[in-house]
Amino acid sequence: MKKLIIVFLLVTSLLVGCTTKKNSDDSVEQVFQPYQEIQKDSSISLGIQNVPTGYMNPAKQQGKVVRFDYITNTYDYQDRVMKKYAYVYIPYGYETSTERYDVVYTMHGHTGDVTSFPGELDDLTDIKNVIDHLIEKKEMKPMLMVFASYYHDNVDMETDDYDASLTEAFGKELQNDLLPQFEHAYRTYASSTSEEDLIASRDHRIFLGFSMGAVTTWYRMMDSMRYFRYYVPFSGSLYWGNRSMVNEYGYDNPNWTAQLLDNAIIAQGYTAEAFYVLALTGTKDFAYRTVNMQIDDMKQHSDMFHYDSDEVNGNFTLLLGENEEHDYHAKRLYIFNSLPMISQMIVKRDILLSGNND
């Protein structure tokens, strides 16, 4: 009889333990306001929150990561056709939905590749889990994410400028090939891949990058504004740009990056109302000094750049991760924080433009 009681108690204990573990992820409270609650007069707070441990575990509603192949060109002296590929995050429910999806074009840093954010197809990172949870909890809009590479043939290249020239040149590949081919294959806000429709859907497109991917992001602000409203550079500045440009203006001269951006925005036919820059870096990141220099320079050009501190009112801000360095941990933190904020901005703008929510 005693043995039966002991066995019963052990089984009961195991069942209780399993139930507690199963519910642990469900009990994680939301960190951000659900995007569906955003109204035309909602304030959008700016700040960095820590990633709850539960968000790093697999979500119930899991998106997937697949490979997307496309044809492009070197767009240099070689003038060579290339077959390249990107990894694509497809949110849970995409296949059964008829909705259109925002797109985040995402770029790795120096020596990185398309796996730098999501991982390998058979060994995905917990960044993917974080995105799944944010979408499941309605803290960010379901978005397609395109993890691309600026390297020719998707192969790391030896360069004498830490890839700066490649980050600048990627604009032609993006505009002419990757963007139209991807948005032809997937259901985005572009009604077609005509130039007119791609431009008309710019409010639902984001460019995001880490390190030299952040440099890529700043360059896209200078040449691709017709396709993108939102720019999210993680830990990188134009002071890391191509060597000829930096030599011309000076690596430690803080007074040229904002004017360069200002001139490029105007040359593309846009104004201060046409974009938002959500920059993030860490206080212990080696990129911090030059990122902060660029942000300070932009603050001096208030006709074009209107700085936000606590909430979204202007068109750019810098959020700092306390003690964050230049690493994967910081990347995950910035993904976790930036995508909900951008989602809220997109929803609020859609409401204001539609005239709904009166």
Predicted region positions:
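Positively charged n-region of N-terminal signal peptides that target proteins for export
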Residues: 1-4
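C-terminal motif of bacterial Sec signal peptides marking the signal peptidase cleavage site
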Residues: 14-17
